[in-house]
């Protein structure tokens, strides 16, 4: 996260009941969640090779009374038995979309293999044992597929107060979500972009969307 979660919580006076983290990778943000008193965390990661890392982190953070649930699927606007996941030499750049301008900007990062994985709507994981009322913040980092994933969250967005997401101003991945796509989709659910940060390159960065007061 380029933008400090502590600063976000303080500036927008957020009370984080729980986080839905889509594209959890190796759980790098878990300590930040702990520092900001987040007790309920959902980690969704498409790359099955990273799940053991997340399970180990869950074991460690259980000692700090964090409730962590781990899911291995690609967050998508529909539920499918199989979808392609393109694994890259830097696993943080892996995506369900193929590299495009990313190859020009970061030529050392290449696709190394393709996995066939399940895809699922995020709003389908909630039930009597996993209550959406315990979650009000989405953190999404899935390399250009943000709109597809957020469409699969549409049934729970009324419960969400803030969304932190990676954004693209150019096609780093083939047919990737551009920031204006996110703006136009999320405004329908009452979210406005309040912070934009592009510290590494002008074509991509992070953004924070907050639900505007009614």
Where are these regions (language model features)?
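Phosphate/nucleotide-binding beta-alpha loop and adjacent structural elements of enzyme active sites
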Residues: 1-214
């Amino acid at each position: 996260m380029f933008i400090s979660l502590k600063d976000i919580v303080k500036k927008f006076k957020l009370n984080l009941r729980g986080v839905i983290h889509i594209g959890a990778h190796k759980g790098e943000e878990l300590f930040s969640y702990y520092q900001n008193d987040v007790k309920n965390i959902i980690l969704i990661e498409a790359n099955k090779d990273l799940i053991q890392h997340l399970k180990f982190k869950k074991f460690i953070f259980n000692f700090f009374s964090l409730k962590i649930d781990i899911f291995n699927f690609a967050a998508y606007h529909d539920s499918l038995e199989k979808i392609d996941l393109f694994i890259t030499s830097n696993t943080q750049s892996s995506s369900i979309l193929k590299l495009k301008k990313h190859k020009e900007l970061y030529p050392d990062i290449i696709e190394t293999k393709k996995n066939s994985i399940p895809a699922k709507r995020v709003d389908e994981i909630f039930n009597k044992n996993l209550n959406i009322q315990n979650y009000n913040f989405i953190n999404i980092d899935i390399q250009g597929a943000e709109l597809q994933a957020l469409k699969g969250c549409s049934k729970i967005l009324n419960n969400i107060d803030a969304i932190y997401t990676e954004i693209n101003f150019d096609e780093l991945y083939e047919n990737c979500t551009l920031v204006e796509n996110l703006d136009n989709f999320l405004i329908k659910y009452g979210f406005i972009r309040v912070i934009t940060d592009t510290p590494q390159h002008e074509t991509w960065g992070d953004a924070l969307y907050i639900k505007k007061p009614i």
